[in-house]
């Protein structure tokens, strides 16, 4: 709460089995990476002088030394904020720049072209339509490199000069029927689940894979076809890679109930959501499912802060 990056937040996890002889998707060797230092989204780590803090609360380190908060040998107290510092427009620009550069390096290494050789794409999605909104700026460069910009201009109904530049042409193209059809075929299946979950950070692109597999489950013709992955992490870094679907990949999806997992989630109130972030919630919001759960956190002696877990059997 109370962060400009709040609307990008989500929660979830995706588990994958990585095998030497996979039955669903075989990853290609080629990988493209782009890295550049950027403060587009980060959770600050701040340090405060311990003596100044003690004075601010009306005491001294000597009088407070027997309290575990003050008794550490460090001269500073560090604060790790969970509320991010976020610059949305700048982060979008970083996303496009990193993905475009990483994609170029991937294409050079793989000897492939995303526009021609990928039947679909999975994006890192900090919010629902990030991929489809950012892709026109990147795709126009790819079309231009292949001498196909006139095709985009025809679909957009305006030339680059008439639109007022490449970025304006990308915006016009993104509203065209041709681009909407492109999104429905190549991008939509991979973003459907994330639209209902939100940003899962590292897991986001793999939720895209799960979503795409479910979305393409009735496509028996996709064995041997290549799926592209475009990841991004603020700070900033992108990794682009691809994988080829196995001929019988649909047979491996029988136990995958994505819709059931989404429908059976437990909703919480906004007050509970705020309490979780403020760390004022004193207990779990839902009964524990089978597995290891936090039992208690020790509060005394050398065990101060030690977390104890117990196993719950349903």
What annotation goes with each model-predicted range?
Residues 1-2, 7-21, 203-218:
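Active-site-proximal alpha-helical scaffold in enzymes
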Residues 2-5, 83-91, 117-122, 187-200, ...:
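Cysteine-centered functional microenvironments
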Residues 7-105, 236-314:
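Condensing-enzyme catalytic core mediating Claisen C-C bond formation in acyl metabolism
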Residues 72-76, 100-119, 136-141, 145, ...:
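Phosphate/pyrophosphate-binding loops at sites that engage ATP/ADP/AMP, CoA/4′-phosphopantetheine
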Residues 116-190:
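Accessory "access/gating" subregions that flank catalytic or transport cores
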Residues 128-132, 188, 195, 203, ...:
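Feature representing long, continuous alpha-helical segments
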Residues 185-187, 210-263:
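Catalytic phosphate/nucleotide-handling subdomain of diverse soluble enzymes
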């Amino acid at each position: 709460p109370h962060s400009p990056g709040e609307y990008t937040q989500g929660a979830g996890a995706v588990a994958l089995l990585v095998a030497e002889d996979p039955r669903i998707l075989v990853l290609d060797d080629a990988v493209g990476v782009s890295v550049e230092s950027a403060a587009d989204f980060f959770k600050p780590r701040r340090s405060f002088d311990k003596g100044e803090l003690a004075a601010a609360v009306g005491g001294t380190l000597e009088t407070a030394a027997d309290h575990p908060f003050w008794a550490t040998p460090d001269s500073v107290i560090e604060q790790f904020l969970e509320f991010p510092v976020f610059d949305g427009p700048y982060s979008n620009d970083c996303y496009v720049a990193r993905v475009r550069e990483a994609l170029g390096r991937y294409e050079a290494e793989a000897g492939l072209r995303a526009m021609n050789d990928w039947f679909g794409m999975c994006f890192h999605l900090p919010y629902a339509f990030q991929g489809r909104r950012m892709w026109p700026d990147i795709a126009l460069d790819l079309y231009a490199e292949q001498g196909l910009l006139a095709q985009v201009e025809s679909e957009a109904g305006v030339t680059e000069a008439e639109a007022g530049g490449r970025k304006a042409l990308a915006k016009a193209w993104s509203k065209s029927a041709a681009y909407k059809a492109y999104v429905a075929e190549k991008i939509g299946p991979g973003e459907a689940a994330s639209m209902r979950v939100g940003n899962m950070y590292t897991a986001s692109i793999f939720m895209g894979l799960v979503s795409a597999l479910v979305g393409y489950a009735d496509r028996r013709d996709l064995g041997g076809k290549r799926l592209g992955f475009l990841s991004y992490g603020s700070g900033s870094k992108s990794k682009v890679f691809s994988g080829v679907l196995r001929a019988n990949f649909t047979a491996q999806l029988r136990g995958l109930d994505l819709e059931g997992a989404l429908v059976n989630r437990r909703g919480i109130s906004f007050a509970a959501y705020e309490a979780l972030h403020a760390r004022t919630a004193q207990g779990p919001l839902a009964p524990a499912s089978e597995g290891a759960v936090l039992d208690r956190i020790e509060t005394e002696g050398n065990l101060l802060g030690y977390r104890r877990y117990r196993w719950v059997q349903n």
